[in-house]
Amino acid sequence: MMMARKQDVRIPTYNISVVGLSGTEKEKGQCGIGKSCLCNRFVRPSADEFHLDHTSVLSTSDFGGRVVNNDHFLYWGEVSRSLEDCVECKMHIVEQTEFIDDQTFQPHRSTALQPYIKRAAATKLASAEKLMYFCTDQLGLEQDFEQKQMPDGKLLIDGFLLGIDVSRGMNRNFDDQLKFVSNLYNQLAKTKKPIVVVLTKCDEGVERYIRDAHTFALSKKNLQVVETSARSNVNVDLAFSTLVQLIDKSRGKTKIIPYFEALKQQSQQIATAKDKYEWLVSRIVKNHNENWLSVSRKMQASPEYQDYVYLEGTQKAKKLFLQHIHRLKHEHIERRRKLYLAALPLAFEALIPNLDEIDHLSCIKTKKLLETKPEFLKWFVVLEETPWDATSHIDNMENERIPFDLMDTVPAEQLYEAHLEKLRNERKRAEMRRAFKENLETSPFITPGKPWEEARSFIMNEDFYQWLEESVYMDIYGKHQKQIIDKAKEEFQELLLEYSELFYELELDAKPSKEKMGVIQDVLGEEQRFKALQKLQAERDALILKHIHFVYHPTKETCPSCPACVDAKIEHLISSRFIRPSDRNQKNSLSDPNIDRINLVILGKDGLARELANEIRALCTNDDKYVIDGKMYELSLRPIEGNVRLPVNSFQTPTFQPHGCLCLYNSKESLSYVVESIEKSRESTLGRRDNHLVHLPLTLILVNKRGDTSGETLHSLIQQGQQIASKLQCVFLDPASAGIGYGRNINEKQISQVLKGLLDSKRNLNLVSSTASIKDLADVDLRIVMCLMCGDPFSADDILFPVLQSQTCKSSHCGSNNSVLLELPIGLHKKRIELSILSYHSSFSIRKSRLVHGYIVFYSAKRKASLAMLRAFLCEVQDIIPIQLVALTDGAIDVLDNDLSREQLSEGEEIAQEIDGRFTSIPCSQPQHKLEIFHPFFKDVVDKKNIIEATHMYDNAAEACSTTEEVFNSPRAGSPLCNSNLQDSEEDIEPPSYSLFREDTSLPSLSKDHSKLSMELEGNDGLSFIMSNFESKLNNKVPPPVKPKPPVQFDITKGDLSYLDQGHRDGQRKSVSSSTWLPPDGFDPSDYAEPMDAVVKPRNEEENIYSVPHDSTQGKIITIRNINKAQSNGSGNGSDSEMDTSSLERGRKVSIVSKPVLYRTRCSRLGRFASYRTSFSVGSDDELGPIRKKEEDQASQGYKGDNAVIPYETDEDPRRRNILRSLRRNTKKPKPKPRPSITKATWESNYFGVPLTTVVTPEKPIPVFIERCIEYIEATGLSTEGIYRVSGNKSEMESLQRQFDQDHNLDLAEKDFTVNTVAGAMKSFFSELPDPLVPYNMQIDLVEAHKINDREQKLHALKEVLKKFPKENHEVFKYVISHLNKVSHNNKVNLMTSENLSICFWPTLMRPDFSTMDALTATRTYQTIIELFIQQCPFFFHNRPISEPPGATPSSPSAVASTVPFLTSTPVTSQPSPPQSPPPTPQSPMQALLPSQLQAEHTL
């Protein structure tokens, strides 16, 4: 377009021609000067549209194409640009070149035959239909590119860009190029058009060439030079804009920027765009598996992406993307590598934890060793392709196993070396710990209680400090101290038991005197076990006081062997063996309308009662209902805070009959209020017929809301409360008691315990009052007490098995869990024997207060404390009561090898000889003895029955004589049996908190014999009348249950017996001032009779004399007098002849016998500490009451000692004398010899008896021992008849366990163990676990699920409970049940059905707590649950459908007996047991667990 049209408003258009060196290779060299690249960059500046290669060698066809169009110039197209002054313009770009024929390598012939210099200077260009040029690829493929023609087919050139290549061109001389350029410039100058020199390829420029080019330009007038680089896109636009400015003089002059400055700006622009683009890529691309195609589509619209692609091109953008992907992949691989390297030490610990195995192996050998391990594939994976980071394994996120080729890397080798070093250090530290512990155990300087500071210098050395911190040694030392202290305490407790005679001789009470404590320390002071606790004197004294409390207040809770107290074991055994009487009387109990109602009095001043009542009501439901053991009870509270004599504060009202009372105090004043209120309440009801408040159950509670358990005031209140509780015979709770919470008076657990105790009291009252019980009790012929020592190394189950499993053994009707009834043939007749099985400490309280016909006393031959307790017990037993001593041994071998056993056996036999008792020994390891061994003893008891009963009745009758006439005549008067509720000696001030011996068993069976004997007495208008009334009361009056001792003290001098004389003379009885029974504290334990022929001088007081026909066929009468029942009505003389005369008057021959004495006087081995008994005043140590002292003073005035003679009044009819019916026969029976037994060795195991979690691992969830046993049984014993039922040899089982404990790789088949031995050892493993395999909390859920009636729902519920098992328990349980299921499939051969197996296994797997009634009644449920697990094993553990039951499953014990071969063969008739109740007696779970040999022994 002509410049003349510039004035047009249209956008100005400029035509620019780019010229420079062109021609053949000879002229220009191997490459051009960059004219095409310059044009390309300016016309299409985007990096993707920029092409570096533009060839000038064309074929004829390409030369003739529409793009070249047979011309030696190229039309690059039209470009719009905004110049510096923001004026837009258009530019048509033409490049003058010279195309070479690709065949002749000569310039193509064209319409213009001029040389290049002249053609390039042409200002008028014409070429019809010539197309715009893009790149070389366009030639021949014009249709694939945009087709845009040169406007009008012609152009008028407005200016020239003269290009000079300043790079080092191949085969080109720069000087020659400069000459060519000079000639071309001269030609261009002739056109008068603007010219701008463009230096191309400055990015590769040579400094001299650039300088020469500038020199050339300076030599020309106004010739401007622009340094450019088309490849780097530097100053390209500047060159064209400079030319446009020269063309259009009106435009401002363009500033020419040097190349390096422009390059810096361009580089900064590219760097900024690159940063933005990389940020965009990092934000979008997170996974190294992303591909460019999908990511570029996501970035297409992003300006960061567009700017960078414009500047650098798509390829560079892709390259950056690939670099980012590579970086992500590298980071991913490194993360995986770190995970693998972190897991590698764990793999080493799991696969090669034994240092001895790898200590001397190289890394290569270790790799081979790892591959041989069974769990190798659990930790490692061997890849087919290596290395692992170049395979797809890096993307396998689910597989966390370590690639095995990682072991070849340096970090893995370093970790292996670190593992080796760690094992070596651990071994050394373990050696140091072991050496330190051995040092502790062997050092004589380490004693219990020695502080670490004192012990450190004796046991520490430099090696210890080098390997372990001192804190580690202190921890080991602390544990060692705890062990030796616990051991010393146990040994000291055993020492106290070995001196039981001392404690009982001292007659200690709740507050022993300093003198008696001094005696104890003097006696025990030389014992090494006493000295062992010399640094723990406070704890030693506490143990002594605790033992004194046990002696003074013996209960199951205070027993040193608690919770393994014999009483608890006996209750469990008997309750498991029989249905309890309370169950049989349940219907009668339910008939009581008040059975579900509890009336509770809360006594406490200053708001204590109201506050506790509010707390209890807060625990109740909205309608004052309280839940106890799942049953709802109506709770009625009566808080009392004022004077109880007022009707408004009375304990009972016409509508409120209290069942118990909670007494609260927090100060001395409130405690005094409680005592005064209780005494007033009892006094107000004294003498009433409904006098039940005297025996109201009481609980004394110290309220301490602040939770402070220290301080002198609090300790003083506790001591005073304990003393008051002792006097009131009630339970005491102090702030330190379990269950008392901070800020509260009492918590829900404690409330439940109190209410349960009240319910038990109500039930016992109803039970004792039942008519059936009285009838049964009256039919008992003999009452025998069997005494066992708590803590003896024998099983009560084995000792009592012949008794409880005997066919003649029945449940006692007294409601006691400590007694049974036996019907045994003794002599010519069967006798009903009530056998009470008690601990020694429970038996002490009944020696003088209960009627007992004989004692069977057991002791362990290898335990000193056992024989010591026996000696202490026998000291206070009357010598008329037969004694059977039973020594328990470990067998003949043990007796021969053990000096202690021999000595104790010998001593027991000597004691038996000296007291005319019987002696036998029983081997504990072979408890196959029968009741026949006691028959000689029972015969002795029958022979001495009359004198025992008469002596006991005389003691009660003598006390009964002090009551008023109203007592004997009133049908509602208290029975003399009530005296048995009170203790006879000071050591029994506080009775046990649980009833061990029935109060109604003292005398009722005497009536049959004594009513007959009393008819033989002549002229029995005196004492005989009283006796007949007394016996009548025994037959008709039912005694109440155990009642607390009344707080009122009595003086024996009030018991005036002179009314006996008045009754004979005046025909009437004189009432006594006291209308209450004499308490046992009112007479001396030596109130027995002695022979009349011992009286040799006149008596100044009358004595009680009574006689009983010795033998009616021989006419013998034994006359015995009491030396201590003094009369108050004058004195007289008497002689032996008078006694003989009175006897001869009845025509009877008199035989004289001695007074009953205690066994301590007959045996030299008993009462070795008797001297201490007389060293101190009889009675309470620090609280000796004035009444007791007065009694002693009065007693000492008339006579002293057992042999003192009391004057006897001679006048009056001898028929008024008191008569004792007694018969004394002394016989000696042959003593059975003990049978030998096998000694059981013991060892400490690190495998058996430890928690299950210690013998399993996540990799090996089944204990190795169980796995070996089951594999052996399934391989050899599935066809064994009675597998798991027939017991293996005990010694072999122990040998198996011991050998396995030493070598876990033990081969059972090689050792030739029997199947039954292996089976028994496997069951023993589960029995010895600290917790049962089926956890206790899961057992509750299982029982609840079992209650569901629908079978399918029940099984699904059980399966849900099974999922809650701890993982270790679940895996082992699944393994065992699956094995039992397999065993049951062979039941046709082995006779072990799923039911039989469940009977054998449920106690082993569940081990329920039989101390609760719920557990006892659920035993059948437990067995059924295990049976279901075995039957439905595929359903429970292997996701199989529920299988149908195999035929009719026995639902009753009788059915069980028909299918289980090892149950008793005795015919049994029983009804199916109701749900949640124990099975009938013959098929109780305990019986099923006992050896079959013993169960067959029912017939005696």
From Swiss-Prot:
UniProt KW keywords: Cell membrane, Cell projection, Cytoplasm, Cytoskeleton, DNA-binding, GTP-binding, GTPase activation, Lipid-binding, Membrane, Nucleotide-binding, Nucleus, Phosphoprotein, Repeat, Repressor, Transcription, Transcription regulation
UniProt region (Has GTPase activity, required for proper localization), positions on chain: 1-266
Domain of life: Eukaryota
UniProt site (Arginine finger): 1285
Residues in FF domain copies: 270-327, 368-422, 429-483, 485-550
PROSITE patterns noted in UniProt: FF (PS51676), PG1 (PS51852), PG2 (PS51853), RHOGAP (PS50238)
Any one Pfam family match given in the protein's UniProt record, by short name: Ras
Protein name per the record: Rho GTPase-activating protein 35
Species this protein is from: Canis lupus familiaris (Dog)
Lineage: Eukaryota, Metazoa, Chordata, Craniata, Vertebrata
Gene encoding the protein: ARHGAP35
